[in-house]
Amino acid sequence: MEALLESRSGLWAGGPAPGQFYRIPPTPGSSVDPVSALYGSPITRTQNPMVTGTSVLGLKFEGGVVIAADMLGSYGSLARFRNISRIMRVNNSTMLGASGDYADFQYLKQVLGQMVIDEELLGDGHSYSPKAIHSWLTRAMYSRRSKMNPLWNTMVIGGYADGESFLGYVDMLGVAYEAPSLATGYGAYLAQPLLREVLEKQPVLSQTEARELVERCMRVLYYRDARSYNRFQIATVTEKGVEIEGPLSAETNWDIAHMISGFE
């Protein structure tokens, strides 16, 4: 009888026992914190982003799209990293700018880069279109959000394919839409009204006009957004491909600064 009981208990070695809590061990490939798994602690998730980037601006023009983002990585309110790029070239027809957590942006860059390599290895003459990248990002962001482990980013995707300009938005919840002008972060309050004001009067802009407007908005953001910086990149996509310029800086004028008081 004792031998029978021992043989039965051996089937559950390391498994659940009557009157005790049992934590199901993680499966291979599951995203469980090793420390949490070892000590039976709750699964942890990112509650707040650490190093963050502020606004990204996007604007369509006749024959392409322009995107701009500054090069500051803020650690809370500290201007910690002042020479980081928040714009990436995805392929010859697509570019992407991201605000929010910089580590999550680096992760997405790695994933997208590998996707593009895998597509090119097929050698079938096809590549991801801007709309395809935008659609994939909506699914990826919504998937992570549904697992209660979101990527803390808001992204602007710009591209030019089949004779059409594309400008799309995706946030950390998977919310997505397309628009002639886009702005994330503080730029949604300060820069987007300036972009829309011009587009309402002149719906189709030239490349030069679009660039001048974006540079003006970057200057306004530097004046008014405490998390912005006067060093930025401007990326342009046309039928010729993607071109990223920078670091650039805007001319500023602080002559009236001594007249502003009462906001201390």
UniProtKB/Swiss-Prot annotation:
Keyword Nucleus (UniProt): yes
Entry-annotated residues carrying N-acetylmethionine: 1
Lineage per the UniProt record: Eukaryota, Metazoa, Chordata, Craniata, Vertebrata
Entry-annotated residues carrying Phosphotyrosine: 102
One CC-aspect GO term: nucleus
Propeptide: 1-45
Role of this protein: Non-catalytic component of the 20S core proteasome complex involved in the proteolytic degradation of most intracellular proteins. This complex plays numerous essential roles within the cell by associating with different regulatory particles. Associated with two 19S regulatory particles, forms the 26S proteasome and thus participates in the ATP-dependent degradation of ubiquitinated proteins.
Organism expressing this protein natively: Bos taurus
Protein name: Proteasome subunit beta type-4
